[in-house]
Design a protein with these regions (language model features):
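Extended, charged coiled-coil "stalk/tether" helices of large eukaryotic trafficking and scaffold proteins
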Residues: 95-99, 114-117, 123-130, 140, ...
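Extended alpha-helical solenoid scaffold regions that build the rod-like backbones
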Residues: 1-129, 221
Length: 280
């Protein structure tokens, strides 16, 4: 039964199927449901897996368990087997992420799916088979994927704001900064309006991180320079978004809505090439 499951994972006939918005893939849902249910019978499976040859040591990342790499022989056979099966799943998901044309969406996909894997481990008997070190390691990896998403998707928006938002500059320069920020922010929101973050806690964490990087700086710049560019009425002629509007639009992200932020603006998918790996 377990051999059949691993074979199904390895073959994965839908390897090029993409989930809209970068959400959790059906393969992830099915595989983790199966493994979490299987973990409930660990007391029976221990003796069975003890007779199986262990996965190749080179295929398991360093620090994969609480037990040091040099002492893998002490890890229960069932723990090694569960870790191996999840690793096979993660490698398949890594390959699926490569099929997204938008690199930032690839990282949303990786974040969502790894977060689901970790969540299922934490809320099942897999937690006791894999150990706290495994959980900590993969939680950190999910956060890194989210950080990579923020950098790729919102880096241009953040870069449009000055490092010192209260520095004295000319009205023309202030007007141009506000204009560029509004344009890049609108483009980013438009591009990502269908993106999904499935886990509510993770969704809020990403929004809060973006708000710290964008809303706070933009608000400080906006409040400092709106009078120098001619007052509230004048700034509204080229600033589509006030600071509170930026916060509101960020709050609406990651639910997979198809509503447009504004009239569609052209934006090309990133051609940035990458290797996205769950493995170390």
């Amino acid at each position: 039964m377990v051999s059949d499951f691993e074979s199904t994972l390895q073959k994965d006939s839908h390897s090029k199927s993409l989930v809209r918005g970068g959400g959790v893939h059906p393969l992830t849902l099915d595989a983790m449901n199966y493994l979490s249910n299987l973990a409930d019978y660990s007391h029976i499976l221990e003796d069975i897996f003890a007779e199986w040859p262990p996965p190749p040591r080179s295929s398991l990342p360093e620090s994969y368990f609480d037990t040091p790499q040099s002492d893998d022989s002490q890890a229960p056979a069932i723990s090694l087997r569960m870790a191996w099966l999840i690793l096979v799943l993660l490698c398949k998901l890594d390959g699926k992420a490569e099929h997204y044309k938008d690199v930032s969406l690839s990282y949303i996909f990786l974040t969502n799916n790894l977060q689901h894997v970790v969540s299922k481990v934490c809320t099942s008997n897999l937690r006791y088979l894999l150990g706290e070190e495994w959980i900590t390691r993969h939680e950190a990896k999910a956060r890194q994927f989210a950080t990579n998403y923020e950098r790729l998707a919102w880096g241009k928006v953040a870069a449009s704001l000055p490092e010192n938002p209260t520095a004295v500059i000319s009205p023309a320069a202030a007007k141009e900064i506000i204009r560029k920020f509004n344009l890049s922010f609108e483009e980013a929101c438009q591009k990502q309006r269908t993106f999904v973050v499935s886990d509510p806690k993770l969704r809020d964490e990403i929004k809060e991180s973006l708000a710290r990087k964008l809303v706070a700086v933009y608000r400080e710049f906006y409040d400092t320079h709106r009078l120098t560019v001619g007052g509230e009425r004048n700034v509204g002629s080229y600033a589509r978004f006030a600071p509170e509007d930026v916060g509101n639009h960020l709050s609406d992200l990651f639910f997979g809505t198809t509503e447009s932020v504004s009239s569609p603006s052209s934006s090309s998918s990133s051609s940035h090439r990458r290797r996205l790996r769950f493995r170390s």
